[in-house]
């Protein structure tokens, strides 16, 4: 009795094979699913049908990929390679059948799902703009392991095939058709007819373009390999992210050879799967799921969002909410303050919404509201004005007089504690924080902030709203700087202290980037704005017992050198880019990396110890998605554990002896 597959043969002798994983919302290729598939393919091999069609029993979802949970059970590269090779042998039985075969894809088709579909002679994709076809393994520190490195190049060619695998970015059906990944586009009503027609007519199967086949000739492969390596090295270092380099080397050694490519792929997959990079990136994948599971289900429907404050943060929050389907009113003192936000919104919609009609509908959902009438209709009001306690409280008094029953008020404050803000409210327990990060369209985290006695129903609405607009919520307690800003502050502060000591700015940033940060801390300070960084540092200094180092920030702010927005900060900025002078031979401290990163790790441990976040997993997730902390290191607490807690504490003590008590290990280290 098959648990996950259903096989039927029609009067024409066509076998219709449907995958519908039992007790699951989505199809994944777990070991038992693959074993059952093997049994069906063995049977079909003995009694070949006139054609084979694979489809999914899940609505708008084909196959999500391999079961990542099973990867935790493997202990050696050899064990992983054996698993991959066994799966390959099962999938290759599809290609060995003497009849034409069709994979009818109805929705998300990622990783192993796309790999199995590429074993079929023909592939059908659904209509629509959704990007459902992809090989995202590289984002987990892996590469395709079920035959994808061979078949993607055989079908699409080295250019398009490698692009799919090296970026991990999915494509929609139109793009898939253009690069040869699928053969037809058909909807729910006609995919069966299209599949039957393909089996009956047997058109030529997709092959890589001639140019790509020439590029795969042995003498040319080393040249193409070097081009691919150059492309990848500009985005990821081999010691940080080895899998894209392994992918390129696989192709350089084997091309798209069916004879040697599959086994080599399995062995390479085994090696990358057992690296710290892959283990940590898989951990980050599961951390995303943990963030999404926060909060209870709520029946409250948020249709209308009212945002007060049309500055960079407020305006971009409003635009993002409109993009995600909400009706949004944006309030500020005068229309001239709202207009720049509307202009930025139009640019966002132009990039994100391809269809002109849908783009116009999206833009129509965002309305300027100088009078603030939208507050009376809103289900959720987000305050995003400047960081001033009295100004915010005056606004709250006016808003609560307008709000309809059941509406929720939230603040986007980055530094003021909720306990102080809410004292003027009639229902202080229903007041929450929704702290977004800049740029709103790029950074996926929102801190959902509470006080000790905050109403859980209000928090659940905050969680639902955050997830509904495609962001990751992080629950945290009201505390100075909350989580992300608090952890970032000592990192940026130490960078500015190094700058004051005369360490070249470029060398400071280089040390952080070499660790794996997305940009250096000096460039980050300039991007955030020196005035904002100074303000947050002041809040943290007064609200915690942490000492901030001596820096030049006050003098730069006094001169009006605020960073990128004024064209001058620590760096000179031209056309939105920092001009970084070459280091002039000034010696760089041996402990520069620890001086930058360990204060950040120390502050993360302090947040955990003080209960600002519930556990180390959530803290690591928040810092990764809120700051870009090197994902392949798994977060600050995970990094400390991998390096060794005793080793990190000893390093902090050494830094404290040399540079001051601000490096002293927090008492929370004893709890790790």
Pin down the residues of each PLM region.
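Glycine-rich beta-to-alpha active-site loop
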Residues: 88, 93-140, 144, 312
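Structural preference for long, well-ordered alpha-helical segments in enzyme cores
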Residues: 37-40, 44, 116, 317, ...
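Short beta-strand segments
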Residues: 18, 55-56, 104, 435
